[in-house]
């Protein structure tokens, strides 16, 4: 196994946390979908520049998309939009502690989805490590929020809890789907496959969320433009996080990547 995915995943997790921290500053200035839009629209130009550097600067061939790739990208893009919206929505609840804690079950869901969709099962040893790490992350998260086991079970019926579980599912699904997209290109350069997948994904996401905002939330585009400085910072941090995630997904199982990324 190529262990390059380990430092790449650590970088992805760092910049994802940075992006999320920056994105919270937009919460009071934009709607939930407006803040979601920023992540994709302002990351896309950076994704295009990076792909151009790889293709033109290093003389690498541009991947040739196929129908399977298109299907993976569409599914991955939509699930990631849903995840981002749900995560931002979750922070608007005063009692989101249980929800954010249970969203950490994402890695277990990734392992299951990867086995179903990509026919890639983790080894028994890795499965044990994933379960132990997930329990550890849940315990740490619950301790941070001062949650008891009983409190978590009592909160299972709350809307914020269900949103948290849904966050874990859609984040896990997008990870698996984007791995499927990059691998379906069958390209010699994993870096180029990851970069090409990210360009197409963020473009599609930008188009879809733009249509939503223009149709249902008129005025949000203007608000985004008014906050372009912080939006551009969010987009840059988000691009680095995304290209690191996508690259790691091409190097090894998404379950391993998400387990380390927690």
Specify the residue positions occupied by each region the protein language model found:
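Hydrophobic transmembrane alpha-helices of multi-pass small-molecule transport proteins
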Residues: 47, 112-115, 124-145
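Conserved extracellular-gate-facing transmembrane-helix segments in secondary transporters
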Residues: 170-174
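Short alpha-helical packing/oligomerization segments
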Residues: 251-262
